[in-house]
Amino acid sequence: LALSLSLSMAGAVGVSGCSTSESRFESVPVQDFLVAEKELPQGFSSSPIRGNELSRATEGTQQPSRAECREPSKQWFSVASADNQAGEYLEYPAAEVVVALLLVRPAGSLTHIDRYIDLCQHYIRQGSGLTLGVSVKPYSVPDKTPGARAYQERIALSHNSAHGTVQDSTVSSTYLYGNVHGVGVIAILRSRKALPTAQQTASLNAIFAGQVEKISRTYG
């Protein structure tokens, strides 16, 4: 599955003229870098993420207990205009794969992600009657994505009731970040389990690596 994903998604948007390749690259709308229908591997479907949904596709509406633990993608999107943001959900129901692919120009700070991993290994998010205990650990970036950053969050869900705080379940989110010639690429895998399956992470890695390759080829 991972191989077919990477091959299927490695197509490029053509840009002509070597002398003006950079300026032409910068004129390509970020939504053009999303996965086209014809690039979807068998069994996958896609649906757009628009407007405020882009923010909710990251950490939702819960707020962190410490300011430095604001999910890094929030910072990336806060400095980009709406025209320079795009996203889509890529789903493979047979393997319970749901990946949010988000693009933003300009890309944000990768060092901010390093600080997040270092400083926010354990913290709390709260909001809408929910309490999320978050544990953060590094995650290995896929091959052929030099300079990328990655981490995995294990999230213990609980809610408030008349009898106090009730523990619900533990889920996970895995994040991949890349800066590809100024275009920020963020891929997020949600799993209903404490740890994603090998097939789920293989799909995430292939989607991210394929997107990095697609944008790099467009650049020239």
Please place each PLM-identified region on the residue numbering:
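Bacterial signal peptide processing site
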Residues: 19-21
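C-terminal motif of bacterial Sec signal peptides marking the signal peptidase cleavage site
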Residues: 14-17
